[in-house]
Amino acid sequence: MKEKDFEIMAPVGSYESLMAAIQGGADSIYFGIEGLNMRSRSSNNFTTEDLRKIVAICGEHGIKSYLTVNTVIYGEDLPLMREIIDAAKDAGVSAIIAADVAAMSYANSIGQEVHLSTQLNISNVEALKFYARFADVVVLARELNLKQVHEIYQEIVKQQIKGPKGELIRIEMFAHGALCMAVSGKCYLSLHEMNASANRGACMQICRRAYTVHDKDSQIELDVENQYIMSPKDLKTIHFMNKMMDAGVRVFKLEGRARGPEYVRLVTECYKEAVKAYCEGTFDEEKIAGWDERLRGGFNRGFWDGYYLGQRLGEWSSKYGSGATRKKVYVARGIKYFSGIGVAEFEMESGSLRVGDEILVTGPTTGAVMQTVDEIRVDLKPVEETVKGERFSIKMSEKIRPSDRLYKMEKVQIEKELR
């Protein structure tokens, strides 16, 4: 098969992440606007006014744009749902990602392409056949193993199950990122404890906290493996992507709309490279080891295989927050870029920066640019280190803009089990 037969879908929660996804080689991006998406109140979101700009940027770079409209929708939400889908249609959004039949039906009625959300928990071919009348792409339940995915794929081909476009239904699966302890994300813990519904895009992620389990009758604290008994490790499938492709997965969805642009670029690049390696027949252990090492540098809670390989049940994180091998520390803001000589000027606002440091520069147009500092100049003179208050210049491989943020990447010691 060819690269064009597969799709890497990157998460976008900001213009910085949008540009980072493009830099990473994404084939498509998915995002939300205010209301009716599963990150509507738990992360940054765009507005309806951003739709045309996002679609235009995607069009300029030849990638598809998918808008999430996948929360539980109540009667009072129907006017807003129609308004959002109308705006998506008018702006030229490639497809909406929906979980409610009301949204699917309305989108179909106005000619807006639909993809099915994992919230539907589609676990068998009969359910897929029912929903095929609405959608051309389906995200199967995250709890399936690859044998079950392959059986559904075989039935799609055998029965010629097609969507509204008249083409065979394409299978999409989550490939990387955060996992929820609940089946297909249908969790009520946040609503119960914080009056903020995960099914309405307002998850407070209290499952990520440390807990102890107490037996009220005996007053004995139960022995559990670690305190983070409801916080799963992150999904990582890059080491068996070849098996996912062979099983019939065609769209690889990367989770992370609430994560930074450097994460988006890193993860997108690695999975895009994996697709290319598979198609060129060079997918091997050496490359897998390289991708693994790079991915450990991005935000993660430790990694496991999900349910795909059917080898074991959930694995739980052993700490709060990220287990990344590197962290970013803000040090400077962008001033000017001299395109003729490929030099960027910054002003130090915190800490220090030395020759040999790894840096990350982010911005709404710049995206996420990472490199090593080869030389620093202050007042045109080379120095080994620059500190707060100084203006300095460095060679940059890509253009930066005024007010871009420069971070120094620092190594982090992590617990062995997170690896």
Predicted regions mapped to residue ranges:
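Charged helix-capping and loop-helix junction motifs
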Residues: 44-50, 79-84
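Short, glycine/polar-rich helix-capping loops at beta-to-alpha or helix-loop-helix junctions
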Residues: 123-128
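Surface-exposed amphipathic alpha-helical tracts and adjacent flexible/coil segments at the periphery
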Residues: 1-24, 28-40, 52-55, 61-71, ...
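Well-ordered mid-protein domain cores that form the structural environment of catalytic cofactors
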Residues: 81-117
